[in-house]
Amino acid sequence: MTLTVRVISPDKTVWDAEADEVILPSTTGQLGILSGHAPLLTALDTGVLRVRTSKSQNWQAIALLGGFAEVEEDEVTILVNGGERGDTINLEEARTAYSQAQTKLNQVPAGDRQAQIQANQAFKRARARFQAAGGLA
């Protein structure tokens, strides 16, 4: 048995294919989904979705910018604020953005809560893109 996996962002369908396994970046940690999984609705954090396809048995990475996932009857529907397949991300650009976001996060003044939140979100986005592109394990 396989899963039907759809990743949908406001402006495009990021992924629509069969898969053997999915690993979701939920707000409470990584969540593995296999065929026959119990029905589930969960919030997703900014991070990397990993999909193991039936055809190649290779893992495909997709950077997600938060959203929700629903699992029901071997169908995984993922609605995200933004998503980008790892194989479409330029690794060097992602590496540069990750490094810059990390530097900015480290330079935020300790008392500026709003700046800390914004820098942390930018860092999480940059890290997800860099990981999906293959830059971080």
From Swiss-Prot:
GO molecular function list: ATP binding; proton-transporting ATP synthase activity, rotational mechanism
CDD domains reported for this sequence: F1-ATPase_delta (cd12152)
SUPFAM superfamilies: Epsilon subunit of F1F0-ATP synthase N-terminal domain
Topology class, membrane: Peripheral membrane protein
Recorded GO CC terms: plasma membrane-derived thylakoid membrane; proton-transporting ATP synthase complex
Keywords assigned: ATP synthesis, CF(1), Hydrogen ion transport, Ion transport, Membrane, Thylakoid, Transport
Subcellular location: Cellular thylakoid membrane
Main localization, broad class: membrane
Oligomer status and interactors: F-type ATPases have 2 components, CF(1) - the catalytic core - and CF(0) - the membrane proton channel. CF(1) has five subunits: alpha(3), beta(3), gamma(1), delta(1), epsilon(1). CF(0) has three main subunits: a, b and c.
Family recorded in the similarity comment: Belongs to the ATPase epsilon chain family.
Function (record text): Produces ATP from ADP in the presence of a proton gradient across the membrane.
Entry-linked HAMAP family: ATP_synth_epsil_bac
PANTHER family: ATP SYNTHASE DELTA/EPSILON CHAIN (PTHR13822), ATP SYNTHASE EPSILON CHAIN, CHLOROPLASTIC (PTHR13822:SF10)
Protein name: ATP synthase epsilon chain
